[in-house]
Amino acid sequence: MNLYEMIIDENELMSGVNALSLVESPAIGSDWVALGDQKPILLAEVNADKQILMGAALIPDKPIYRNMNGEEFYIYFSEETVAKAAEMFFKRSNQSNATLEHSQPLKGMTVFESWIVDNPEFDKSKQYGLDVPKGTWVVSMKVDDKDIWDNYIKNNKVFGFSIEGAFSNVLRSESAEDIGLSDQLLDGALDLIRTFIKENIN
């Protein structure tokens, strides 16, 4: 199965991440933490319901399964591309661009905090229960729309972020295992199984 690296062409105006979407099944296999419901003890009395989401926007070197018109393949983002995507997201003032399931534009959504994980063991995201590798792009999003929070976040209709944007691709291998990503592929397969169970066994 072909493996493509996704890259950013800085000469293309639309290249990179243009928006974040709230989705039921994040392709990167990482759910968010709803800080209105799960608060660290030190902040528990500050605000009962902050309506803030924290989660991974992009995880580096993690193969993501794709099927387009019957063609199956994997894509991945390098650590360098993840960092560049995060930087350009803010440079182009896209922090208020959000959608629901990649279809419905949302208002009142703002990414106010963003960072690249340097040391997973001591990263801020760890205290909120996120377990992501070095190089992951983590964001915090304020949800000002109470209807979205109540109907989709609190009711567990969406579970994570999914990026929207345009990327170029480079074929890196006709077999993902050739570049030493077999463990990540196994993780990706497990994520697909978990998604199937979540969607079909309720």
Predicted regions and their residues:
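Active-site-adjacent segment of 2-oxoglutarate/Fe(II) JmjC oxygenases
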Residues: 202
